[in-house]
Amino acid sequence: KDIIEEIVNLVHEAEERFDSEIYIVSDEPYRKIIFDDLEYPNVFELHNRYIVATSHSKDLALPGERIGYIAVHPNIDDKTELIDALIFCNRSLGFVNAPALMQHVVESLQSVTVDVGEYQKKRDFLYPKLIKMGYKVVKPNGAFYMFPRSPIKDDVKFTEELLNHKVLVVPGTGFGLPGYFRLSYCLEDSILEGSLSGFEAAISKYSDN
């Protein structure tokens, strides 16, 4: 919440400086996948001109499904104009819509989510193992990704080294984080356990660098 409040404060300062209304658009597909008893803040309490876009592909474990919604503050100005613009974008840009049945039931899905505890257990299994091997990584508070620092500057080269050990990760360069790599731990426990030897072998090769 502190980070979001900092962003909102910056927006409020900019609105005063430029005498203009500024909208915050937040993409929040992981808002329900939070660990350690943390809670996601109600962003609409912080800023009237807040637009939230979210997808149930993550919190319902339906990868690839186009099921979600866009929510705006109830006191936002020009709601009709905004809705018209969203409908226009959806029609003209060729997005794939959710099946009609899912569009009707999506409202009833708001209190439903995957077992977040399962993701947290996987995080709690993998994180200390990577730290012990020598990887530098921030412990995530949600979702199901980690961004360890590559032990060498060339993150692409290191991901190729991991691939040689049958561990598939993605270079951080593709996410604007050169020098890091992204791994996903929403996998079977046996796969996570099987990856440990590969992570160990890869970092051992560059441990003196």
Where are these regions (language model features)?
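PLP-dependent class I/II
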Residues: 1-209
